[in-house]
Design a protein with these regions (language model features):
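Small-residue-rich transmembrane alpha-helices
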Residues: 118-119, 345, 383, 419-488, ...
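Negatively charged linear elements and acidic catalytic determinants
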Residues: 1-104, 307, 334-336, 345, ...
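Alpha-helical transmembrane segments of integral membrane proteins
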Residues: 69-100, 132, 352-356, 386-412, ...
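Short juxtamembrane loops and helix-capping segments at transmembrane helix boundaries
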Residues: 120-136, 143, 273-290, 331-333, ...
Length: 892
């Protein structure tokens, strides 16, 4: 059996499970020997007390003999741990207030950190489901001027694929909204157009059926096949096993199902979930118009995904791709004018758009750092609580040590108590993490779907319990060692006397750290609050109040250009006549947002660099509806709004474009060249509109407005200014659309105010959470400050009594107490200001209209903490003034 024989093992197991009976036998045996030894002492002429004392000395300490016997007969470590847990539970039940405060202190920090960790895990860390070897995948992005739609064609991607040996595979993709019909009407679904061996590059295995064949992926294919997601399969086919070969209607066309994606896979990007995948050849069918995918200028794909060849690096792939792209630009000079100054960037990992990953990642790292700082503040407060508890238990520890308890056993018992508190704190922290998750619910990050709040999973729970355990080991050990050293260093005579100065400086240092760290969070929170205020005050160039946007898509349902124009005209006339509607218009883009196509605007015959302006095709009442002022000239007439661009109806320029082209001259009546993907046309300028912004942070967006006319659009926005609620307006407008054609989808209903607020969603979430963390940190710091000051008053009670006995005024006593608080605060403020500046520097790219050295923020934060310090000192000051000098001197 090795070190332990079978007989001894059986004895130890029996002792472990039947320990109570054996303990009674041991007690009886020891008592018998004590009585026999006491009788021998009495026979030698000793008194009864001396005989009993001599008998215990012979045994070398009764408790020690019991412990050594237990260790010899059983599993000592397990028995001791269980005994210590029971002892700690009884001790904590005797002091429920201490236990509740300690558990809540830890739970606050653990809950906050766990909630943010779970959010980061859900958004950034979890791999895309079903993907093989995700570490080998890279995202290739065409990056350049913000606000432009940069796309590559099927032919361009084929050339890049062939010229990049560092990649084992390269595929393009682009997301588009489509509609499918159900029994209740049209429903919007998310479609992804893919090029190349998209599924093969990702290493996916279909749940049912197959992926697209090489023939189906060719530019000349019919494009009439579809792969559906597992979610779509369940929602629309009830998970029927014979789904393969059946058809599904998307927009106005029908597609044959050839495969079902694996469960959990909803596309390369985690942005809400792709429902269906279509080959590139289906692009023309999507919009119900002929599009030759083989045409090199048929740019569709916004991002590419590649798999690195064995032994190749992302840097090498990026170098080869940039060289290949430069050759394409040189070979086809006219085709790449709008992206000639762009470049291909390679980024490791998939799951999020590169810009979203970088921006949201920074925000989540800031949140995680703030939550970790709050956890550290809670841990320090927890350590301080254990130190104060150690002070009150010095007498108990000293007595137990005198009775024979060893130093390791005493330390183990105190550590067990701390770990038990941490375990409860971790469990409560999981509950608080769920509550904090409610703050996330409905919150949106740019490029991500609204958070549903259900981000807490097994990893997050393990993180919570693990952090609580680590906290218990670290922040219970030091207070236990300090209090044990202090208790064992005292004599039995000193037990019960006033406490000494030992550990006082350490406790004060902990409180200084708490206050400084809390001030750091408070300064950062105030910076973010001012940022939100400044963002809300930005003049965007339109009046968003009571303006609602709705989406309709007649063209994908089979409408030609003329039918779509008639449909929009009828929508406008009927919506404008509804009660409560003050203005209505349609446009190709909503007034807020920067994701628009850029056109080249030049003066005829000029060799100057073209002005790139975001386009928007609008109806005549657009400017009235959104509240954008016409600074010169006029808006479109009702007749002009129905004209095709080739008829030269005229355009409206934004103020920035007008100044760039004409300087201070009046541009109204002048001709300009408008160049887009479909060619160049001469247009007269009929008006100049005030500048608008695509977001509160961006500058004025160069824009050109054209009449919507017979433009063929994948989606049209209906803009309504109303004196009604969004839901009421949605019902009215929806009924109009349904009465004209119930098969035309009606979706994306939201207020313009909501869209604007969403643009600063990350800043609002940061401000809300960092502000919450700062408030909790301030409360914890106030509690710590109160504890140190009250402890100081208790320790100096005799001194205060003597001072008052010899004539000290109450004001001087108050000054003594408050002065102690202010000394701690002054040191903490210096450290906190430095920490606040460092934190604000990290927040700099999130701040707007304010700098990390904003003096008002620091003054307000310091004043707030001064008030908190005074409030925390007030109870102790009152207690000090009420000290009775007579009773104090009598006790001495």
């Amino acid at each position: 059996m090795g070190l332990i024989g079978w007989a001894e093992l059986r004895s130890r197991v029996r002792s472990f499970f039947c320990g109570s009976a054996e303990d009674r036998d041991l007690e009886e045996e020891l008592q018998y020997h004590l009585e026999r030894e006491t009788e021998l002492g009495l026979r030698r002429g000793l008194s009864a007390d001396e005989a009993r004392r001599n008998a215990r000395l012979v045994f070398g300490g009764y408790d020690r003999v019991v412990e050594e016997t237990r260790e010899a007969r059983g599993f000592a470590l397990i028995e001791n741990v269980l005994r210590d847990v029971r002892f700690a539970a009884r001790a904590l039940r005797r002091e429920p207030r201490f236990a509740a405060v300690a558990v809540l202190t830890l739970a606050i920090g653990v809950g906050a950190t766990t909630a943010v960790f779970s959010l980061a895990d859900a958004i950034l860390l979890r791999p895309v489901a079903g993907v093989r070897d995700p570490g080998e995948l890279v995202v290739v992005q065409l990056a350049g001027q913000p606000g432009a739609i940069a796309e590559l064609s099927h032919a361009n991607i084929s050339d890049l694929r062939a010229a990049t040996p560092a990649l084992a595979g390269l595929a393009g993709y682009a997301s588009r909204s489509m509609q499918t019909r159900t029994a209740t009407g049209a429903v919007e679904v998310e479609a992804m157009i893919v090029d190349g061996d998209y599924f093969g590059v990702l290493g996916l295995v279909p749940r049912l059926g197959r992926w697209f064949t090489a023939e189906e992926l060719s530019a000349n294919a019919g494009g009439d096949v579809v792969v559906i997601s597992d979610r779509f399969w369940g929602a629309y086919f009830d998970r029927s096993p014979d789904v393969l070969g059946r058809t599904v209607q998307l927009n106005a066309e029908r597609y044959t199902v050839v495969g079902v994606a694996p469960p959990g896979f909803h596309g390369t990007l985690r942005t809400g979930g792709v429902d269906v995948w279509l080959p590139a050849a289906a692009y023309g069918r999507m919009w119900h118009r002929p599009i030759d995918i083989a045409d090199r200028e048929a740019s569709i794909f916004t991002e590419l995904v590649g798999r690195l060849a064995p032994g190749r690096t992302p840097e090498l792939a990026e170098q080869q791709l940039r060289t290949s792209f430069a050759r394409l630009v040189e070979s086809y000079p006219g085709m790449f004018d709008h992206v000639a100054d762009y470049r291909l960037n390679v980024h490791e990992g998939i799951g999020l758009a590169v810009s979203v990953r970088e921006q949201t990642g920074r925000a989540l790292r800031l949140l995680l750092g703030s939550a970790a700082l709050l956890l550290l503040i809670g841990c320090v407060n927890f350590a301080n609580l254990l130190l104060f508890r150690g002070v009150t238990r010095r007498g108990e520890v000293g007595v137990r040590a005198a009775l024979g308890a060893s130093r390791p056993r005493l330390l183990q018992q105190q550590l067990t108590e701390g770990l038990l508190l941490c375990a409860f704190g971790g469990l409560l922290g999981v509950g608080l993490a769920l509550a904090i998750g409610a703050i996330f619910r409905g919150q949106e990050f740019p490029g991500l779907p609204p958070i549903d709040g259900s981000v807490l999973n097994g990893s997050a729970v393990a993180f919570a319990l693990g952090s609580a355990l680590l906290t218990g080991v670290i922040f219970s050990a030091l207070p236990a060692a300090v209090s044990l050293r202090d208790a064992l260093g005292r004599t039995m005579r000193s037990i019960g006397r006033s406490v000494s100065d030992a550990g006082s400086a350490f406790r004060s240092g902990l409180v200084i750290f708490q206050v400084a760290a809390s001030l750091t969070l408070l300064i950062g929170a105030l910076m973010l609050v001012q940022t939100i205020r400044n963002l809300d005050r930005v003049d965007l160039g339109f009046d968003a109040e009571q303006v609602f946007t709705f989406g309709i898509s007649p063209e994908p349902q089979g409408y030609d250009a003329e039918a779509a124009r008639a449909f929009r005209t009828r929508i406008l006339s009927e919506v404008a006549a509804l009660p409560g509607i003050t203005a209505a218009s349609v446009s190709s883009f909503a007034p807020f947002g920067s994701d628009r196509m850029l056109f080249r605007i030049t003066l005829p015959g000029s060799d100057a660099t073209p002005v790139r302006a975001a386009t928007n095709e609008v109806s005549s009442a657009y400017f009235e509806t959104v509240g954008t002022r016409i600074l010169a000239g006029r808006a479109f007439s009702e007749l002009e709004q129905t004209a095709a661009l080739t008829d030269g109806p005229g355009i409206v320029l934004s103020s920035t474009v007008a100044r760039s082209l004409f300087g201070t001259a009046n541009p109204v009546g002048q001709l300009i060249e408008v160049g887009g993907f479909t060619g160049t046309s001469l247009q007269p300028v009929i008006g100049v509109a005030e500048d608008t912004r695509g977001s509160p942070r961006s500058g004025p967006q160069p824009s050109v407005y054209m009449p919507i006319g017979t433009a063929s659009l994948p989606q049209t926005y209906v803009l309504v200014r109303a004196d009604l609620s969004l839901e009421h307006t949605k019902r009215l407008v929806g009924s109009v659309v349904a009465s004209i054609d119930p098969d035309v989808p009606f979706y994306t209903a939201e207020s313009l105010t909501t869209a604007i607020r969403r643009a600063a969603a990350e800043e609002r979430l940061l401000a809300r959470l960092v502000g919450t963390f700062a408030l909790l940190a301030v409360l914890l710091a106030a509690a710590g400050l109160y504890g140190v000051i009250s402890y100081s008053v208790a320790r100096r009670r005799r001194e205060i009594g003597i001072r008052m006995a010899i004539g000290a005024r109450p004001t001087s006593v108050v000054q003594l107490v408050v002065g102690r608080s202010m000394k701690l605060l002054s040191v903490a403020l210096v450290l906190g200001i430095a920490g606040g500046y460092a934190f604000s520097t990290l927040l700099a790219n999130r701040m707007f209209g304010i700098t990390p050295l904003d003096p008002l923020t620091y003054v307000v934060a310091c004043l707030a903490f001064s008030i908190v310090a005074l409030a925390a000192s007030a109870p102790s000051a009152v207690a000090a003034v009420r000290v009775d000098p007579v009773s104090t001197l009598r006790q001495e």
